[in-house]
From Swiss-Prot:
Gene: panC
Domain of life: Bacteria
Lineage: Bacteria, Bacillati, Bacillota, Bacilli, Bacillales
Entry-linked HAMAP family: PanC
The protein's name in its UniProt record: Pantothenate synthetase
Active site positions, chain numbering: 38 (proton donor)
Amino acid sequence: MTKLITTVKEMQHIVKAAKRSGTTIGFIPTMGALHDGHLTMVRESVSTNDITIVSVFVNPLQFGPNEDFDAYPRQIDKDLELVSEVGADIVFHPAVEDMYPGELGIDVKVGPLADVLEGAKRPGHFDGVVTVVNKLFNIVMPDYAYFGKKDAQQLAIVEQMVKDFNHAVEIIGIDIVREADGLAKSSRNVYLTEQERQEAVHLSKSLLLAQALYQDGERQSKVIIDRVTEYLESHISGRIEEVAVYSYPQLVEQHEITGRIFISLAVKFSKARLIDNIIIGAE
């Protein structure tokens, strides 16, 4: 049965004891409202590590002034049940006051990796992500940490953070988990109307179009972006906020495509903003 830990002090006590005995720790940081994408990461950790820890913490630092922290879905009882079913050992669910007992004296700034894509639209968001992930890594001290490729910019930033701050953890990127029709699984999908849900499948279909163009030899980003945009405009009612091609993991905008690339989409429906991506090409 999965154990619920609610304080930093108790979590640190458990981790220190585990480390002394040579136990390997797998860690999945989340903000809760778990779905199959999260559970895939939990299963991967359970199959590899002696102990699997899942954090459920809605981090206020990564919410902007126009983003409703209080409205973010919280369902700790259901989350605990879900991860228990797939074998997680511990859910770490601290209070905000325990994670941030006072005003932070040191600000962590991400830099250029956060100046594009989602980071450009949400100033300070990735500073908040890096701050909380740093804290969680120091508390949990994982050997392996699992992040979804659906948030590919976040994954690239966390990998750079681990390198820059010498964290003794290996980051494992987990492929996007999709519904049977191709829609990327997301906590936000519940906010889609029935019509929007039918339209949302075209995000992944447009990425398959981009992949086909690339495989046919197209190397001009503008051609791919224009074709994807045209496809989306003819299939969805939501507002297309982004169709972009960047190098990966460097996140430099590409015009003439070389090497590994990241094609990113963002579409705003009435009550949900959906993102999706595909990473293609040689490293």
